């Protein structure tokens, strides 16, 4: 996965590949993790000859809703050093409780519902995430634009044990007074979610 957002993995690993070299082996590798994109402050680091380029664990305590930047520096057996471009991963809700309540229709309804929520935003948010869970299948649209590229979300779950949720970065899709053409104090947004039965109830 490249720059994943909103996952709650118990174990997080980083992998790397060195290209455009005739060297045959890694002599040293260093992994750096920071909360800052410029790595001006290092939160955690690990260095050694035997770091696993296929999957090296990031062994530090992570917080919910947090973006961590990762950089790898590799020195090969010819003395050449390569530094990766910064990558990142962002944690999800983790153990944070859900504040919302389930939204549904009447039990006897047989149609596929469409739920709509209008909300206003003044200033551009520093970041905005949509954390969404649906029993069955869902598709979300923000201001008429489909959220994400996935289809048939949230995929298969064992509903007796868990419900999957997805995380979407919607920062650039939210209308605000900074990117809204009309002279208003707030900009109105609309979130629309359509639901289908999926694996949860009935056949595909």
Model features per residue range: what roles?
Residues 1-7:
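Short, compositionally biased P/S/T/A/G/V-rich stretches that sit at domain boundaries
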Residues 11-15:
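A short beta-strand segment in extracellular, disulfide-stabilized domains
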Residues 16, 50, 67-71, 90-95, ...:
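Accessory beta-strand-rich segments of carbohydrate-active enzymes
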Residues 17-22:
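Acidic, Ser/Thr
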Residues 24-67, 73, 77-83, 102-103:
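Recognizes extended acidic, P/S/T-rich segments that occur
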Residues 45-46, 85-87, 106, 150:
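Short hydrophobic alpha-helix segments
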Residues 80-102:
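Extended, polar beta-sheet/loop recognition surfaces of beta-rich domains
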Residues 100-114:
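Compositionally biased low-complexity segments at domain edges in trafficked proteins
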